[in-house]
Design a protein with these regions (language model features):
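Short, well-ordered beta-strand core segments
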Residues: 30, 112, 134-135
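NTP-binding/hydrolysis catalytic cores, primarily Walker-type P-loop NTPases
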Residues: 209-238
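Short, conserved loop/helix-junction motifs that constitute active-site signature segments
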Residues: 129, 153-158, 183-184
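Walker A/P-loop phosphate-binding motif and the immediately C-terminal alpha-helix
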Residues: 2-37
Length: 238
């Protein structure tokens, strides 16, 4: 069985990347590999505290070449937790790719979702190199579109799908047109949009939004959109 890799990546922080990775991992039944070393990571969202551990299973797995043990919880994705020390102890691009492929073979899942640190580093580039789809949330804001434009120029030959995120009820026309211009002439695709909802940012539950049936009323349009994104990813990689 060949595992498909979904890599959630952007060149800017604060765009909703981690939430999207978390929800996609749940919807696809995928382990979530957290390669983020800053605060606000998927690991913290999951309830994992590296401060309470004496070592990092992620760093040990990269060093020893053995698959890390997946952490499991209720109504949230299985997790390989990240660690701040990854920033200064990154494996090479090829070392990262080889490790992720080996782990996926051991886990035997159809999908693996990888959440990355913003920007281009060795460990990030390793994950991108094996991605079947690179999912990038894009708020329709000038500075975020600047970062997206730069990323598309660099990664136009990668399987990139842009997901308009935090979209207000009336989307800003100028930014919508700019997004179209950014992908024009490239194979980069634009997937389903995710509507803005203040409740996403203030929610404290660790469970995936899409694990609740039904979620809170304010989150229901977001949950519907997330399921549409998951379906798009499945069709894209079919």
């Amino acid at each position: 069985m060949s595992t498909k890799f979904v890599v959630c990546h952007s060149r800017k922080g604060g765009v909703g990347k981690t939430t999207l990775a978390y929800e996609l991992a749940w919807l696809l039944g995928a382990p979530l590999v957290d390669l983020e070393w800053e605060g606000g990571s998927a690991s913290r969202k999951w309830g994992y505290r590296y401060e309470d551990r004496t070592s990092s299973s992620l760093l040990a797995a990269f060093e020893k070449g053995t698959p890390p043990r997946l952490l499991r919880g209720f109504n949230k994705p299985d997790l390989v937790p990240g660690h701040p020390d990854l920033e200064l102890n990154q494996p090479s691009r090829d070392g990262t790719a080889d490790a992720l492929l080996k782990w996926a073979g051991e886990w035997g899942r159809d999908w693996v979702v990888v959440d990355t640190h913003p920007g281009a580093t060795e460990v990030v580039n390793g994950a991108l190199s094996i991605a079947h789809v690179v999912v990038t949330p894009v708020p329709l804001r000038s500075s975020d579109l600047d970062g997206t434009e730069h990323m598309v120029r660099e990664l136009a030959d990668y399987p990139v799908v842009l997901i308009p995120n935090f979209v207000p009820p009336v989307a800003p026309a100028a930014e919508v047109h700019r997004l179209g211009r950014i992908v024009d002439g490239t194979p980069v695709q634009v997937g389903p949009l995710i509507p803005a909802a203040l409740a996403v940012g203030t929610r404290r539950k660790r469970m995936a939004i899409t694990s609740e049936d039904p979620p809170a009323k304010a989150l229901q349009p977001v949950a519907t959109a997330l399921r549409q994104v998951a379906a798009f990813v499945q069709e894209y990689t079919a």
